Amino acid sequence: MLPELGFLSLLFATTAALLLSIVPQIGIWRNKPTLTNTAWGLSYCFGIFTSVSIGILAYSFATDDFTLEYVAAHSNSQLPTFFKVAATWGGHEGSILFWLFTLSLWLVAFAFFSRKNDRTFSAQTLSLLGLICLGFAIFILFYSNPFGRTFPAPAEGRDLNPMLQDIGLIFHPPLLYVGYVGFAVNFAMSISALIFNRSAQAIARAMRAWVLVSWLFLTLGIVLGAWWAYYELGWGGWWFWDPVENASLMAWLLGLALLHSLMVTEKQGAFNYWTTLFSLLAFAFSVLGTFIVRSGALTSVHAFALDSSRGYVLLLIFFLLTVGSLSLFALRTNSNESAVKFPLISKTGAILGLNIVLTVATVSTFLGTFYPMLFQAMSWGSISVGAPYFNSIFLPLLTLVLFAMAATLCLSWFKTDKKRFFKRLLLLIPAAVIAYGMIWNALQNDGALRFHFFAYVLLTLAIWVLFVTLWQNWVKVKLAYFGMILAHCGVAITTMGAVMSSYFGSELGVRLAPQQSQQLGQFEFHYDRFSNEIGPNFTAEVAFFSVSEQGKPYAEIVPERRYYDVRTMTMSEVGLDAGFWGDLYIVMGDNLGKGEFTFRLHYKPLIRWLWLGGILMALGALCSAINLKRKRDE
């Protein structure tokens, strides 16, 4: 009975979305406030019905209701309860319903916070959000219904994919979805501004708060995903240039460009075109990311759906959103933009340069991600575009981004003090010395490493950004700029962690039997013993290592190989000793008999700085959003 109630709630939600997309529009264009004001009540109704639907699905997982085909395919009675609940969004149908639920949260939030604003504009925005909700609700009803029954019910479920049985994967998709879907708000606001022929400056401050929160969650989702890839997939890296990773990166880059563009638009009335365009594309690329994950069109470790027909529907939604919004943008832009002149060598000019670089990075990522699919669709054969392409593009672009970031702090909005600018420029000298010292120390610890010029340049610029950011605000930190300080420091720290761990880490593949040792740089790994253990829904082979540094005990590390009976899958669980200055990392490979295994030993310097920098970026966005709310309340 409960699953039927969940499906019925989904039908009611679809009806509410349909009414929301039509009734307020009638009120707006016929000047009938009573009909216009229905936007708020219908938004709350949609949120309630969607919440009931996702809640019933989660309850079905928690109670092992294997009469639901979706539950039977993605859960098991032996699965720990928190993984059962997380399995709600572990497959295609549940993830799309969760996507819709997240969209309903943003819809309700906008309805709540806009109730005292311009009623006509807010109702138009809510109605557009309702139209987006309607599209995805119809998609779920006809192509991705998670409430389908199966009779007779299987005695046991197929279990959740072992790759997803991890604490990181409980929070990673929700954070990404909140970030992705949040861009729908600024998308709808921009469309409303185009419909009412308003400039982006008129809504810049209101839009900026929504973008900050969306970008905050997207940043946390990406950071958590990179952390999961690092410790769960067992390949020693944190970014694979996987199509799904690229999709989140493209949305993140566009969101970052939008934030900087909004700042200029609000302050000077410039960049109206940029602001509107970025706000439209950020959400369109979020939908594109959903298509990549759930269509199976591109090979990805994240793509768990292989039904291409559902992918075509998502692609159609992406096409309608993109073409429709860009067509309206093209029709309306001539009357929106007023010429605002500014010196090229200024803070505004530096932000313009930053936005151009971020746009090039997004386009380059898009081409690298979809070129293999186009190549195959045209029957030209198959081709793979991997890390060499993306690294060759992003290394010089990241160099420009870091320089532009520092320049925005060194320059003024209109007239720049040259003496002040060159003082900041001189900070490059100590930055270069420190960067060289960090690399020299890494080379001394492992003679197999080599000097990388580009890595040195990036490290120098990252330290320079850190110096300039702190120097600029050391004497008097204004609350208005505190978020910016945290975010810029976060970018610098993340870059330092990425460069040091990627270029100056140590790695070695070995085969070891118990009581054998292996040296890696300044560390000695001693394989103490081996045992077999039984988990709640798996069996495991466990190796115990003790690590010493120059003869002194340093760490105890325990890698595993787990076998999941129901899914008949073997997964490596890395052994990890996490430290502020670096991680020791062991991946357990094939069993060679009598306790002998193959292992991969890693040392990753400053890898933790990646996560620290990401958290600082998110905190920076949070502080900026709080500051905007404080200004609004004053």
Tell what function each PLM region has.
Residues L11-I22, S95-T150, P154-A226, G234:
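A conserved hydrophobic secondary-structure block that centers on an alpha-helix together
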